[in-house]
Design a protein with these regions (language model features):
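A domain-start/cap signature at the N-terminus of enzymes
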Residues: 17-56, 106, 133-135, 140, ...
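Active-site machinery of serine-nucleophile hydrolases
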Residues: 56, 60-111
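C-terminal catalytic histidine-bearing segment of alpha/beta-hydrolase fold enzymes
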Residues: 159, 175-238
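Primarily recognizes the serine-hydrolase "nucleophile elbow" in alpha/beta-hydrolase
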Residues: 117-122, 128-172
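Alpha-helical scaffolding within the catalytic cores
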Residues: 72-83, 115, 159-169, 190, ...
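Sec-dependent N-terminal signal peptides
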Residues: 4-15
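Short, proline-enriched alpha-helix->beta-strand connector loops that line the catalytic pocket
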Residues: 88, 171-176
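Gly/Ser-rich "nucleophile elbow"/oxyanion-hole loop immediately N-terminal to the catalytic nucleophile
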Residues: 44-52, 100-137
Length: 238
């Protein structure tokens, strides 16, 4: 039997100052032959009212954060935001891709699906408000996981990473907001724009933000923008 181990990092923000409480836990499910560690964040108010279900955002990091050191995952994106923002209004799940994989691999897509299902079963997740975002390799993974399970997601925000245009017809039920640096030479704007054009051709809903003066790092300005999170919350999966 192959065990897929999930290392859970519970982050509960303190009510005073900027201090944080962190609880470590270990869990496992039977799935693929990968070991998937992840950071897990519950909103400060999660324990206050047990009748409230919370939106969830899945964050997929880039190529440089792969491995088995969760500290790397905290460097960019959603984990960086929740480390500094006391009132982040989402359950946040930030897995770490093993070194020998990329998010688009079928094994990883199935592992991510299992992870989300597990979180949904064990926490008060609003199943109509599950979102996914990622940067670079994680941007590519964002397109891929939505194509893999479009029914799970209410909206998606890939940053500086394209997808497979042949999957466009699978994406039409999910609104996309795509972000890209115009001067990016790691993942050229064309990668994102091909996906946008393919999605529009099949009737998908997509908006595009192109930063004219940015190179590959188009994620810092994006994740610092409150409008991204407002847009997430404006979309529900019926």
């Amino acid at each position: 039997m192959i065990i897929l181990r999930f290392l859970v990092l519970f982050i509960l923000l303190c009510s005073l100052g900027n201090a944080q409480q962190r609880k470590m836990g270990l869990d496992s499910i039977d799935k693929n032959k990968v070991s998937l560690n992840y950071l897990f964040y519950l909103p400060e108010s999660y324990q206050v009212d047990e009748n409230i279900d919370w939106p969830l955002v899945l964050f997929l990091h880039g190529m440089g954060e792969r491995g088995n050191d969760l500290e790397l995952v905290k460097v960019h994106g959603i984990p960086k935001i929740v480390d500094t923002k006391r009132d982040f209004p989402f359950i946040a799940v930030s897995p770490q891709c093993p070194m020998d994989y990329v998010w688009r691999d079928q094994e990883m897509l199935e592992a991510l699906e299992s992870l989300l299902i597990k979180i949904i079963k064990n926490y008060r997740v609003d199943k109509s408000r599950i979102y996914v975002t990622g940067l670079s390799m994680g941007g590519r993974g964002t397109w891929a996981i939505v194509a893999h399970r479009p029914d799970l997601f209410a909206a998606a925000a890939p940053i500086c990473g394209g997808g497979d245009p042949k999957t466009a017809s699978k994406l039409i039920t999910v609104p996309f907001w795509v972000f890209q640096g115009a001067l990016d030479t790691v993942h050229y704007p064309k990668e994102s724009e091909v996906m946008i054009q393919s999605l529009k051709k099949v009737g998908g809903e997509v908006r595009y933000t192109l930063y004219p003066e940015l190179h590959h790092d188009s994620w810092t300005i994006t994740y610092d923008n409150p409008d991204l999170y407002k847009w997430f919350l404006s979309n529900k999966n019926n």
